[in-house]
A protein has these predicted regions:
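A short aromatic-anchored loop/beta-hairpin motif
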Residues: 2-44
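N-terminal short beta-loop-beta anion/metal-coordinating cradle
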Residues: 35-75
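Short HxH-centered metal-ligating active-site micro-motif
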Residues: 14, 66-119
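Fold-independent oxyanion-binding glycine-rich loops
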Residues: 24-25, 59-61, 82-83, 112
Length: 119
């Protein structure tokens, strides 16, 4: 995953961040994932705090693992999950935390096909 999603640098253009999410998804679809930032060293690096570049509101469906489908690692994404990716009181608080405290420049609301929670 490119450095601009790294938690140790300052935010960059939201367009570049979205492009990196798209590239990660393409790697996942093609079966050529990098598994970035998925090491014990990365976990140790994040002890001092997190600075993700993206917050995602997504469904809690176990068939849609967000970090996996975007080929992201520890600290890259701030993921908020609930059934049907709905904006509940709890998810609103998490979004507020991501935007106001973590200063994420990109918020993605993501749904998926065949979601049983929104039938």
């Amino acid at each position: 995953m490119s450095d601009y999603l790294d938690s140790d640098i300052s935010p960059c253009s939201p367009y570049l961040i979205i492009d990196e999410l798209k590239r990660g998804f393409e790697r996942f679809k093609s079966g050529r994932t990098d598994h970035p930032h998925a090491t014990a060293a990365r976990v140790h690096q994040l002890i001092g705090g997190q600075h993700p570049q993206v917050a995602l509101l997504a469904c809690s469906d176990s068939r849609v693992p967000i970090e996996v489908i975007f080929d992201a690692g520890f600290g890259d994404l701030f993921v908020i999950r609930n059934a049907g990716n709905t904006n509940t009181f709890g998810s609103a608080g998490s979004i507020e935390y991501a935007v106001l405290d973590l200063k994420v420049p990109v918020l993605v609301v993501m749904s998926h096909q065949g979601c049983g929670a929104v039938k």
